[in-house]
Regions:
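Eukaryotic intrinsically disordered, low-complexity regulatory linkers and tails enriched in Ser/Thr/Pro
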Residues: 1-146
Length: 146
């Protein structure tokens, strides 16, 4: 299960949200996004403080023991909210789409030189999770451009 080491409240304008129930955490450089187990937004930050928020959340919330896909940057995605994974014919990037029909994560073809190998590992892992196995760790460096 997702492990929250402590309650985590994030200020959102004049209110706060409890981010402790987030099961997915992604950061792409421009924004930080937290989603719950139903792929609903818990928090979204595209301010200059988004990287700081990402680092703070990474320390407080850990991926689900069985369904957590740990990303290269320390973020994670709950496999149960992934609806599709493919290499975009338009951009050449690997795209993971959520149940909400929005991109969860985009892996850039410039950063990852072996997207064909990487997508195979991710697809196999998703199929195995569907059959009751734990999501394996991915050796991201094996697929990166040198």
């Amino acid at each position: 299960m997702t492990t929250s080491t402590q309650p985590l409240f994030i200020r959102n304008g004049n209110s706060v949200v409890n981010a402790s129930n987030a099961t997915s955490l992604t950061h792409n450089g421009d924004f930080t996004l937290l989603l719950d187990e139903k792929c609903q937004k818990v928090a979204f930050d595209q301010s200059e403080k988004a990287p700081e928020l990402f680092e703070r959340v990474k320390k407080a919330i850990k991926p689900h023991d069985k369904y957590g896909l740990a990303l290269d940057n320390g973020g994670f995605i709950d496999a149960r909210v992934i609806s599709n994974v493919f290499v975009s014919p338009k951009t050449g990037n690997l795209v993971m789409v959520g149940l909400n029909d929005r991109p969860l994560c985009v892996l850039d073809a410039k950063t990852f030189s072996d997207l064909d190998g990487l997508i195979e590992v991710i697809l196999d892992a998703l199929v195995n999770v569907g059959e009751g196995e734990k999501f394996p760790a991915i050796e991201w460096s094996a697929y990166k451009a040198q």
